[in-house]
A protein has these predicted regions:
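N-terminal Sec signal peptide cleavage junction
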Residues: 18-19
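Structural preference for beta-strand elements that scaffold enzyme active sites
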Residues: 37-42, 72-80, 139-145, 195-201, ...
């Protein structure tokens, strides 16, 4: 997530027209079968991360317990992603001096499926919630990050006895295909009952080094039955070109939360209008600065996102992604500060209501 630099009203659900799936008359993208309604970003894979996505951390994103003790389904999509390994190497351009090699790509693919963490923890949590409220209407979806083969890299490693050179687009594409195959192989070997692998997320948030390879990479994963996801940051190179780049699903990052000086009142409506014009979905963003104890307290900005998305018609009709910093949904839930707990309840109820639009309990 590049740092720089919701209340329901009945609104016509076709205000936004996003072309990622065929829809029946009267459907909105939020209710369209095969779409992820609410996808939470779960950063994991670098040693610098404090969150391990254990059972309790995952449960806060799987289900919400209301004031009456009743459970409700929360997020229906889980995006596991990482930008760097925390040891000086990066999975995308610009984050570290050195790019990750094949060995780091392998470590990343494997870490999302270890026992008791990430996908395995989600599987356990969903089992527990199912035992109380039954099966969700929509099987929970997993999206896994796809590292960027960074141009100029010579030390990535070998495939089929050949040293790959990332000045060569064919070698970059082959590395991506290998990683896709590896993730699919590991995911299938785990035999999850509650999770489906929906597709892969292109970790480069700008198109600068991507234009010459993403068509072929996307075609390959689609040939295997998976979707290609992208979440470019606001103003990035190519951030409105997702259809031309052949991504299947694209969310626009507003980046409103991250400015040191709060943007004016027309900022978020402008982002919403851009997303509408380009047929993109939208992302909600907040991090540890939504905690009341943070000296740079910004919880009001989370409210601004939801207000803007409600006013433009996105809140009850459009799939959303959620950038939550390290593990902010759980942090708000377990905080000793009532103001944080209230913010968690308010936020969780918005997600629950959106899931209820999709037919969930």
């Amino acid at each position: 997530m590049k740092k720089i630099l919701l209340i329901f009203l009945i609104i016509p659900v076709l205000i936004f027209s996003c072309g990622t799936s065929d829809r029946r008359p009267g459907d909105s993208p939020l209710t369209t079968e095969g779409n992820i309604g609410d996808m939470v970003l779960m950063y994991y894979g670098g040693v610098h991360r404090k969150t391990t996505w254990n059972h309790d951390q995952c449960m806060s994103s799987v289900a919400y317990e209301d004031a009456h003790g009743k459970l409700h389904w929360m997020f229906d999509g889980f995006l596991f992603l990482e930008f760097k390994n925390g040891k000086g190497r990066a999975y995308a351009s610009y984050y570290e001096p050195l790019p990750c090699r094949k060995v780091e790509w392998e470590e990343l693919a494997q870490c999302y499926f270890v026992d008791g963490r990430a996908c395995s923890a989600l599987e356990e949590c969903i089992d527990e919630v199912k035992a109380q409220i039954g099966e969700p209407k929509h099987k929970r979806q997993v999206v896994v990050t796809l590292p960027e083969p960074i141009p100029g890299q010579k030390d990535w490693g070998q495939l089929n006895g050949k040293d790959l050179d990332f000045d060569n687009d064919e070698d970059r594409i082959e590395a991506c295909k290998w990683y896709i195959d590896e993730v699919i192989r590991i995911f299938k070997s785990r035999n999850y009952k509650n999770l489906e692998l929906a597709g892969f997320y292109w970790v480069a948030e700008e198109a600068t080094h991507s234009r010459t390879i993403v068509h072929q990479v996307g075609d390959y994963m689609r040939s295997l039955g998976y979707k290609f996801y992208w979440i470019p940051y606001w103003g990035s190179d190519g951030h409105g070109e997702w259809k031309e780049l052949k991504f299947d699903v694209a969310y626009q990052q507003p980046n409103y939360f991250f400015y040191q000086q709060k943007p004016d009142s027309v900022y978020l409506p402008k982002v919403c209008e851009f997303a509408k014009e380009r047929g993109m979905y939208l992302e909600v963003e907040f991090d540890e600065r939504a905690l009341r104890s943070n000296p740079d307290y910004r919880a009001d900005r989370l409210h601004d996102y939801m207000d803007a998305f409600q006013k433009c018609g996105a809140l009850d009709s459009l799939p959303l992604a959620y950038y939550i910093g390290d593990c902010m949904v759980n942090d708000l839930k377990v905080s000793s500060c009532k103001e944080d707990n209230d913010l968690y309840d308010w936020f969780a109820n918005i997600v629950v209501k959106r899931q209820q639009i999709r037919g969930e309990k």
